[in-house]
Amino acid sequence: MDKISGFSDDELLVKILSFLPFKFAITTSVLSKQWKFLWMRVPKLEYDEDSMYSFEYSFRYFLPKAKEVDSETYSIVSESGHRMRSFIEKNLPLHSSPVIESLRLKFFTEVFQPEDIKLWVEIAVSRCAQELSVDFFPKEKHNALLPRNLYTCKSLVTLKLRNNILVDVPHVFSLPSLKILHLERVTYGDGESLQRLLSNCSVLEDLVVELDTGDNVRKLDVIIPSLLSLSFGMSRYCAYEGYRIDTPSLKYFKLTDLSKTFSGLIENMPKLEEANITARHNFKKLLELVTSVKRLSLNIENNDAEALTAIYGDDIVFNELEHLNFHIHNAYWSELLYWLLKASPKLQNLEFDEQCSRDGTMGTLAVFWNQPNSVPQCLLSTLQTFEWSGYPGSVQGKDLATYILRKSRQLKIATISIGYGLDPQQKLKMEMDVKFSFRASPTCKRVFY
């Protein structure tokens, strides 16, 4: 009660409104004269064009080319966009909150122009903004240039930019409070803009960088002692020459490297606890970097059977690994998974998403799950949950599920999906084969879907 008594009636109402989605806070203006302008004092603003339409209209407008959009959809989306733009244009400059704690903008129609984005961000920065989030994705692909005052905003803690944003970092700038920086598929003013930005964020803790074709970045060094979380991604056609990552305080690392050749140097991550790796090349080198993690998500996108054989060996052991989420776009997955199980003696949770199957073409790289040479230690002592999303009709996957049930002494629950699109009778037969197989753990619950 003491905290509440410190507020006036209006201040308390504004505080309550700040916990509502902004569009609902605006609607309270019709309640009474007292409420009419209260929303104008809410310090957290969000203008999301998606929220104005049903999913059907957004999908019909955004997916096709502009000339293919039917007149009804175009009219509805365009009129709604104009109303929102007019509303922001009229009310944002007059917003009476002395500090704009956060401004979130998300637009995708040609109604909104790059100049609008620049002006509205400039207003927020002038009000000591702490959080800015801008997602601008018009069909005409015009980039919005951010205002210069953004790069000297001392109050800014969080900056999230997506899609058609031009990040042109000046040679002299200061963002002393910036802790969270997300840059997803944006364009940079020159090849050094991103490097300048990262090299001068001394308290940064959370960084997301997604590079894409035509973004002007060729090389990048991520050397940030304060960084705790890093998500770094490159598209398949990214014209990229190389990167270096040196982050001694990092606890979470996500890497998506779909480039044609691996050209990265990753080092110095002694405190890493969780890793999410999606890659096409150099799997062993990447796995050597994450042997200390407790949680690992591994997504291998490579159809070459021989590319997997270089991974196996006794020199990699995941002594702390408790949770493994394994996705693979390669039919030759069985030996790799068997090796991962052997290399993870403390594994408690296994999720396996089988993307390919090669039943009928078994070769030397296959593991016949009904007769492996030895049982991985984790199955005998620690594995508690198992989830398998199977490739439709995969006998290899069914044999894996049966093997896990037969050998895992501490298993508590097994969640099994045989695969979509399978003949109902064939699916039922596979389910019965798994359901009536022997269980090393008599209390294990099996869930089929």
Curated annotation (Swiss-Prot):
It holds the Pfam family LRR_At5g56370. SUPFAM superfamilies: F-box domain (SSF81383), RNI-like (SSF52047). Residues 368-418 form the FBD domain. Residues 2-50 form the F-box domain. SMART domains: FBD. The keyword Repeat applies. LRR repeats lie at residues 27-52, 81-107, 158-185, 186-211, 252-279, 328-354. The keyword Ribonucleoprotein does not apply. InterPro entries: F-box-like_dom_sf, F-box_AtFBL13-like, F-box_dom, FBD, FBL13/AtMIF1-like, LRR_dom_sf, LRR_FXL15/At3g58940/PEG3-like. Disulfide bonds: none annotated. It comes from the Eukaryota. Keywords: Leucine-rich repeat, Repeat. This is Putative F-box/FBD/LRR-repeat protein At5g62970.
